[in-house]
């Protein structure tokens, strides 16, 4: 996954209601699109409290300008998502995506493991659905297209290549990203792809600009509410060697590694010694600039996948914006999803999913 861009951190002191502030935010966005680093934008535009450049403030300014752009194009986005829904039979997913698009501007990517069809069949199915895709050998390169790669940990039946397969997205964002994700998995399902207990879904969410303390809060928020998230997950993912849960010692190791990390180099240095196969994988920051969430089981159900992605993004948003002492166990799935600010359709889906699974356990 690439160096994605988050959309919310601690509450900013920037006054967004003045012409000067808007102009400075627009200039920050222009500089960022030219490739300038956040710390250099902070220096150039004066985001320097106490004389120290603050890249987080520059990132907030960029996101504020991006949100204005997105809101101004909301009608076009809604029409685009509606058109996708009409042609791919994922209208419920698209409708929920539109409802929450303005709030969910953080970039994300998905990795979805499957088997049952060959890479060629998978690419053809995606292409027929209007999705740019290619089959590639195993790699960690970020592409502008969806890619099909091999995965030795996944059931190989029907793939013709001696291993399972993984669908890896390009960088995605907001309503269009949700709709395209649903469209992609629906295309694979209709082509004959399958999932079983060997398959998982990994969600990467952009973390560029975050501090070590921000990342700790995100992980802590997930961990403290892990039992509530478990209620919507398959039993095979509750104690899984590829997505292990944090115990007290693991959380303390995370805090020790990241609590003083303020910049990219600090976070990379701290994350380097941490374990990868956790429900929340911080080591993905080293290669991709993301935090990876690994717990969800494999699925080719568009509504299920998108509901989980939206939940994960909301956890990133909430954790990054909280104060250290505010992270807590919210007591139930419903209370947690309410605190996350999820849209009603996603909350209803998750609650219904939890009820269904509770009856089978």
Regions found by a protein language model. Give the residues of each.
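Short, charged amphipathic recognition helices of the HTH superfamily
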Residues: 33-45, 199-202
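Basic, amphipathic alpha-helix used for nucleic-acid engagement in HTH/winged-helix/SANT-Myb modules
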Residues: 1-23
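Hydrophobic alpha-helical segments and helix pairs
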Residues: 193-199, 203-205
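Short, amphipathic alpha-helical "recognition" segments used to contact nucleic acids or chromatin
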Residues: 19-36
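C-terminal accessory/tail domains of diverse enzymes
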Residues: 81-194, 208-361
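Short Lys/Arg-enriched helix C-cap and helix-to-coil transition segments
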Residues: 63-91
């Amino acid at each position: 996954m690439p160096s994605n861009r988050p959309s919310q951190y601690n509450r900013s002191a920037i006054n967004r209601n003045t012409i000067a502030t808007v102009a400075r935010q627009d200039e920050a966005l222009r500089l960022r699109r030219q490739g300038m680093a956040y710390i250099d934008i902070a220096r150039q535009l004066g985001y320097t409290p106490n004389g120290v450049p603050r890249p987080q403030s520059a990132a907030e300014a960029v996101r504020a300008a991006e949100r204005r752009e997105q809101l101004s194009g909301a009608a076009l986005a809604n029409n685009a998502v509606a058109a996708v829904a009409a042609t791919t039979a994922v209208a419920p997913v698209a409708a929920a995506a539109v409802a929450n698009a303005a709030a969910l501007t953080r970039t994300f990517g998905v990795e979805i493991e499957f088997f049952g069809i060959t890479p060629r069949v998978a690419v053809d199915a995606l292409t027929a659905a209007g999705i740019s895709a290619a089959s590639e050998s195993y790699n960690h390169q970020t592409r502008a297209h969806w890619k099909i790669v091999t995965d030795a940990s996944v059931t190989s039946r029907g793939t013709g290549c001696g291993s399972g397969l993984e669908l890896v997205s390009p960088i995605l964002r907001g309503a269009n990203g949700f709709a395209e994700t649903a469209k992609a998995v629906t295309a694979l399902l209709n082509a004959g792809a399958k999932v079983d207990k060997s398959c998982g879904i990994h969600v990467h969410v952009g973390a560029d600009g975050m501090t070590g303390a921000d990342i700790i809060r995100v992980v802590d928020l997930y961990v403290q509410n892990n039992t509530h998230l478990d209620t919507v997950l398959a039993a095979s993912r509750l104690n899984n060697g590829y997505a292990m849960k944090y115990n007290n010692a693991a959380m303390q190791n995370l805090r020790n590694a990241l609590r003083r990390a303020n910049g990219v180099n600090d976070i990379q240095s701290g994350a380097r010694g941490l374990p990868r196969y956790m429900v929340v994988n911080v080591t993905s920051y080293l290669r991709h600039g993301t935090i990876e969430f690994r717990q969800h089981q494999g699925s080719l159900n568009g509504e299920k996948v998108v509901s989980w992605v939206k939940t994960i993004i909301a956890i990133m948003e909430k954790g990054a914006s909280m104060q250290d002492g505010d992270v807590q166990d919210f007591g139930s799935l419903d209370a947690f999803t309410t605190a996350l600010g999820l849209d009603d359709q996603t909350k209803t889906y998750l609650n219904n999913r939890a009820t269904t699974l509770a009856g089978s356990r």
